[in-house]
């Protein structure tokens, strides 16, 4: 039976990173692109509940694609239950995101990872792929989309084949892959754990011409992430980070301690 691969992202259906994934995996089976119609960065795993979703067919460099007027999670759901309703995909790949998605902070805010988490929630293994860029401003700049995806494509092809043929290890629902800026085929690939956070939060206060306050949420990158974390691996060591993730976020190690606290205080 031919493998089926659903490709999505959070940068929108026009992002070159989407086609880069398609080119990397098209030889492995039937690859289908279903992605947000517009930029959806930092929406996490949110979904649309209070307005209808629409799917528009479009041509991407000669390839049929489907644009969804919703979030990355909406795109995964529409991909599985509408576009590929006859048979679910065997793998979902989200990316290639322009800008790294590192730390536990990114897991809960990134639309790229959110799409992969929704795939896992639907019982389909998933890979989220992001590329580190050196300038923060490039993360949402159209011009920055013209990246060299060759190293990422090579890695995606290898990972996709492995997951399609063997699945993910028990207890792993998805892989979060981050490729450092300037990576080459010789760049080491390291299995990592999540850093706690990627940014120290900053809130900028401004005044509009009518004297009313408004705010921009911003941040500076954490510079002292522990060794072995995804953030340290990509930013300090300039190595490829692969972090295995699971949907169950229960802090099992502390269950007994929480039970003691409840018992002693209620």
From Swiss-Prot:
UniProt keywords, alphabetically: Cytoplasm, Hydrolase, Metal-binding, Nucleotide-binding
Molecular-function annotations in GO: 5'-nucleotidase activity; metal ion binding; nucleotide binding
Reaction catalysis annotation: a ribonucleoside 5'-phosphate + H2O = a ribonucleoside + phosphate
Cofactor note: Binds 1 divalent metal cation per subunit.
GO CC terms: cytoplasm
Main location per the UniProt record: cytoplasm
Cofactor(s) demanded: a divalent metal cation
Subcellular location: Cytoplasm
One Pfam family recorded for the sequence: SurE
EC number: 3.1.3.5
SUPFAM superfamilies documented for this protein: SurE-like (SSF64167)
Similarity field: Belongs to the SurE nucleotidase family.
Role description: Nucleotidase that shows phosphatase activity on nucleoside 5'-monophosphates.
Protein name, entry field: 5'-nucleotidase SurE
Organism the protein comes from: Methanocella arvoryzae (strain DSM 22066 / NBRC 105507 / MRE50)
Gene designation: surE
